[in-house]
Amino acid sequence: MNESIDSGFLLPQNVGAERLAKQLGGESHCRIGESTEFSLRFFDSFDWRLHAAGLRCLQLRAPQGALVKLKPAEGGAPLDAVAYAPELAWPADLPDSRLRTEVAKRLDMRVLLPLATVRGEATDLSVLNEDEKTVVRLQLLTMRVEAEGLEEARTLWPRLRLVPVTGYQRDLDKLTTYLSEEMEWPQSPDCLFDEVMAAAGREPGDYSSKLNVRLRPDQTAADATRTILRDLLATLERNISGTRADLDSEFLHDLRVATRRTRSALSQIKQVLPEELVTDFKQRFAWLGQVTGPVRDLDVFLLELPRYRASLPGSMAGDLDGLEDLLRNAHGK
């Protein structure tokens, strides 16, 4: 299957390969070929760093193999594509390529996480002329979206790709006009990403560690305080599972930042909340900061270790292996 699946036309849900072939003139003018299954998975960091940079990272699996692509958000040709079958995680694991460089530069210390998976079937069709020569190749794509939080897969609108055949541009133009003007089928969006995210119930950029609350001039101090503290609590809670799973060091970092900001808010916003309540929760959040501190210290040491190695003569770089083992063993306890 051609890895470019996000261009062409959107079809009604009830148009399958046989009906499409009939609409294009029947068996003598449109021949149905093989069908193949494929999957497509979108990736980004937990805090949407690739999205913020206007990039999309995806992994396509088809009978021909597995391919990772980095594309501009507005669609079009990929910036780079590399063959890579393992599940995506750390950019450093990717083959040496522009793709790895670009992704690593944006993600820094963050890991790639799956956003949603598209599973589908691609059916090849051939449009024939009077001499039974193929003048346009078609791919009918039926797809469904799977994602964490969805009880069942959600079906996307079928897509029809038009693949040009050398020497038959006029036939391609004629068919394109027929599908858009006679059938009134809309052009598919240049990027599948937005449709997949909507089906998965995700909003790109729906997480940021930055405090972002809207306070109204007519709010009471108590209401404003609750708004701030609820936002901080939401940030803290969203980072708990990633911290426990040790997906990357930024989950714990963001959890601790939200903790410190909560303690600061409790200290600086005075005479709004009951004093005994403030005292109680200041102690609770102080405890949270204390118990997570040692692990964060280990994270910082491990993040800085490559820089420490680079500062040593080449013959001495391996001398830090024992320190790294010690830090990782302590981190895993």
Give the location of each predicted region:
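Cationic, histidine-enriched alpha-helical/coil surfaces that engage anionic ligands
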Residues: 1-333
